[in-house]
Amino acid sequence: MKKTTEGAFYTREYRNLFKEFGYSEAEIQERVKDTWEQLFGDNPETKIYYEVGDDLGYLLDTGNLDVRTEGMSYGMMMAVQMDRKDIFDRIWNWTMKNMYMTEGVHAGYFAWSCQPDGTKNSWGPAPDGEEYFALALFFASHRWGDGDEQPFNYSEQARKLLHTCVHNGEGGPGHPMWNRDNKLIKFIPEVEFSDPSYHLPHFYELFSLWANEEDRVFWKEAAEASREYLKIACHPETGLAPEYAYYDGTPNDEKGYGHFFSDSYRVAANIGLDAEWFGGSEWSAEEINKIQAFFADKEPEDYRRYKIDGEPFEEKSLHPVGLIATNAMGSLASVDGPYAKANVDLFWNTPVRTGNRRYYDNCLYLFAMLALSGNFKIWFPEGQEEEH
C-alpha cells in the first residue's frame, strides 16, 4: 500500500488538527484536560471511572452496569497517554485481580465482562481488549519503566499476553485470537469470522518490534493483512463497515450484526490513527471521505443503524456522540478532504455525553480529543526516541 503521508512513527511529530483548523493551543490543551476530568473526575453526570480502596479502579459500562475489557484497556491507554501512572496501575490491578483467567480453555486471556464487585459475568474473552491491554502495557513500560513486582512488570506482561494470543491451543486446549493462516483477528477465539473494528494494524506494527522475537514476523504480516482486510470489509461506495464480517470481508448477519452500528464506528477512528502513526494512503483518505460524505447530510439526532450500502433502519443510533467523535478522528487520514474540517468542528462543538449510555461515547470522545490534538502518541523504549 503506497503511503501518501509520513507518519509520526518516522517523524516523531504529531499533527494537531484542532490547531491546523484554527483553534488556539491554550483552548485545545484546556479541552483535553477538561475531557479527562469529566471522565475520570467527580462529575456524576459524565464520569465512567470509579476507585475501590487504595489500589483498584475500574471503568463502568454505564448502560449495561458491567466492567468490560474494552473499557479497562481503553482506560489504561488513556492513562498512559495522560501520564497518570496512579490510575493506570489501579485499572491494571483490578483487571488482573478480577478478569484474568488462569484455568480452562481461555487460560491466559481476560473475561470480557465482570460485575463491579469483580464477579465474572462471562468466562470468555473479547480480543479488542487484549490488543489494547498489550499496547498500553508496552507504552507504560516505555514511559514509566517496568516495576519489579507482578503485575507491574509491564513489558513482560505484554509479551506474555501476545504470546498467548498467537499460540493458545498449540499442543493443548484453547484457541488463538488471530487466525494463524490468514493473520486476521477473530471476533472471539473460538469462531472463524472477524469484527472490522478490531483491526488495528498500527498496533501490530509496534508488536512486530516489541513482542517475543519469534512472533515479530507474524505481527508484521498481521498489520498488512488487516490493512488489506479493511479494504474489502468497508463498502466501496459508502465506506461503511459491518460489526461482524467473514474473512472475505462480507457482512456476517447471522445474529443481526452485519450492519453499520456501534462497533463499526471505531473503524474510521482506527484508520485515522493508523494514518497519523504510520502514514496515510490514497485508500485511507478516500475511505474516510466516503464515510464523512455519507453523514454530511445527516443530523446527529437522526443517526440510525444502516445497511453497509447506506439503507437506513428505523432504529436510531445508541451512541451518536461516539459516531461524531470517530468520524472526526478519521480526519487524520483525510486532512485535505472536503469534509475533514466540518467533522472536526462538529466534534469540537459537541459536549461530552451525559446519561446512562455515556460510557462508549465518552471513551471514543477522549480518544478523538487526544488524537486530534496530537496527544495520542507512540511511546518508544528509552534510546529509540530518535531512531528511524
Curated annotation (Swiss-Prot):
Give the EC class as a word. Answer: hydrolase
Q: Is Hydrolase included in the keywords of this UniProt record?
A: yes
List all disulphide bridges recorded for this chain. Answer: none
Variant or mutagenesis effect after changing residue 263 to G/L/P/S/T/V: Has glycosynthase activity
Q: Which SUPFAM superfamilies match?
A: Six-hairpin glycosidases
Q: How does activity depend on pH?
A: Optimum pH is 6.2-7.3. Stable between pH 5.0 and 9.8 for 30 minutes at 30 degrees Celsius.
Tagged with keyword Hydrolase: yes
* Provenance organism: Halalkalibacterium halodurans (strain ATCC BAA-125 / DSM 18197 / FERM 7344 / JCM 9153 / C-125) (Bacillus halodurans)
Descriptive protein name:
Reducing end xylose-releasing exo-oligoxylanase
**Temperature-related activity annotation:** Optimum temperature is 50 degrees Celsius. Stable up to 40 degrees Celsius.
